[in-house]
Amino acid sequence: MREEEQEEAKLWENVASPDGDTKVEALLQLSYNAAGQQEYTEALAFCETARETYEALGALASSMKMAHIYFGIGHCLRHLNRSADAAIALEKSVELYQEVGSEDALHILNEEGDAWYEAKEYQKSYDAYRRAIEDSNPDTCDSIVARNYVDAGTALEKLKEWSKALEHFTEGRARYKKLKDLRIMAHCDEEISLCYVWLGDGVSALVHAQLALDYAVTAEDDVHLMWAKSRMALSKKTLGQYQVALDLFAEAKSMMVSQSNPPWKAIIKLEKQNADILKKLDRMDAASEVLRRISSFEEIFLDEDERGDPLV
């Protein structure tokens, strides 16, 4: 018998053990093994059985281990695209880790925020990221705090709270500057520029779009070049420089569609901005044609409240 088969046979023997701790450890290891094979339905079943077994121990159950079990459940549920259920499990994991004063709670708060974001529960997502920021020790967890500021800003963008999003991205950028992480600084500049666009400040939007573009060109980073150009286009549009904006939108779109996995949602939004410029230039037929052409894409990639003529 191969070594792996012997190990699995031993785990199943332990699953049958009358000792609760032994059984739970075996179930968790079987869950890890299944997750490693991307068998998340099976991995989830092992985790849930481990939870039921451990809960039956009552006062003997360790909060630390139960927190770990709930984290495993949340991890599996995220991979099964059950994001809201995953967030609830991760929230429970956070509570249990906090009971024992474990710093793991900070990392899992971020994952909880991610899960709520995936579930399109953006306020709950923001709340989780904010708790992670507030519970962190900025002297020892600067990279964690920086990440949570940026993630919180992203949730706020979805809530269209542009001023608050701007504050979070600005703070995140300052922290990533201290960490000398130029790539994420560029991402922050892109989002800061977007916030300024929606706040109607084209000059400030252009400053940060240019910073993002400078990084992308210098680092020869095609992904950030694509996004920086789209931010430059939005900035120019806000400043009324419509032809320059159209040219930059065209460049950004060409780069987007050449990606192996094109960001269709962003492409649709970009095309809507194009149509809006064409209307401002009194080219109504051309604008209508752009909107007609992307209407079928909207049905596939946009949520109901994002469809139709309004800019998103």
Segments predicted by a language model, with ranges:
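Residue signature of alpha-solenoid helical repeat architecture, marking inter-repeat boundaries
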Residues: 21, 61-64, 103, 143, ...
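Amphipathic alpha-helical segments of tetratricopeptide repeats
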Residues: 12-13, 51-58, 92-98, 130-138, ...
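Residue register of alpha-helical TPR repeats
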Residues: 25, 64-68, 107, 147, ...
